[in-house]
Amino acid sequence: NLVISDIMMPEMRGDELCKALKNNIETSHIPVILLTALNNDKDILSGLEIGADEYIVKPFNIGILKANISNLLTNRALLRSKYGSLDMDDEDDHEDECINCSQDIDWKFIANVRKNIEDNIDNPALTVDVLCNLMGMSRTSFYNKLRALTDQAPGDYIRLIRLKRSVKLLKEGTHSITEIAEMTGFSDAKYFR
């Protein structure tokens, strides 16, 4: 997904649209390109400060616009492919989990999701529906947001956090497999065999 908007629009200005998108938890991850005839440094900085990913001044070369679009989408795809796998060696590196967090609101969202999972990690009944309820979001909105930021479905993300905690506990060597399974919400120790 990508939004391209002129700043001078009849219903809502493009910079207002950008600000609304970037301040909404459901849309803050979507890249925004602003097109405008406003070409002074103050306007450009203002557009970038509200969260625009690109600010292109008119008149512009359509090839440059296409290249910017391609670069934004390619970079997001590269990040998804790089961080989409379950890397068990970086259990303490939470920044890698949010591949598409360009706004503070996105980092806070991921931190809140992670906190809710970690607070309930020993509960085998922690499901996507329970997590959605804890986050105060509909299942669809939650799925779309988490998938866009982490390239993980919510169920897979819960499992990822549980597995990372399990790996950490296994490395400590102070608990049995059965204890670790219980401590991380797995109903059966067979997940570790």
Task: Annotate each predicted stretch with a short phrase.
Residues 1-4:
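Active-site beta3 strand of CheY-like receiver
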Residues 9:
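Receiver (REC) domain active-site loop signature in two-component systems and cognate sites
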Residues 60-69, 73, 81:
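C-terminal output helix
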Residues 148-187:
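Terminal helix-turn-helix DNA-binding modules in bacterial transcription factors
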